[in-house]
Amino acid sequence: MAGELILVVEDNEKNRKLVRDVLTVKGYRLLESETGEEGLRLASEHHPALVLMDIQLPGIDGIETLRRLRADAATATIPVVAVTASAMMHDRQKILAAGFDGYQAKPISVRPFLELVREVLDRPPRSGS
């Protein structure tokens, strides 16, 4: 169901704009953050249905941000998808092994990206840590 709140944690404005344009036209509501620290605060305050997160962020990176989200009972069950330029197979495996709920390589292809977002949102809630 469209209308869900999605947090986008991405330091590149062009990438945020692309994701914003793709998701808002489908009816999703967005929060945006340029850093992992701000993303943690927004996730805790707003409890989005999904977090889309870059891996290479200023300050704490996406993997550390995910670790902190999972360690906090208030945000531990929020699904998090990595959206990253790290497209090599070993990078993908490392990212998924870190506990991300999905992986999207950049540049994004709109249809597969929207399918991934919908698929992750439709999954049963994850168990808390």
Kindly label every feature range from the protein language model:
Residues K14, T35-E38, D61-R67:
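Acidic catalytic/metal-coordinating carboxylates
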Residues G27-E34, L42, Q104:
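Short hydrophobic/Thr-rich beta-strand motif most characteristic of the beta2 strand and flanking loop
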Residues P58, A76, M88, K106:
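The feature encodes the CheY-like receiver
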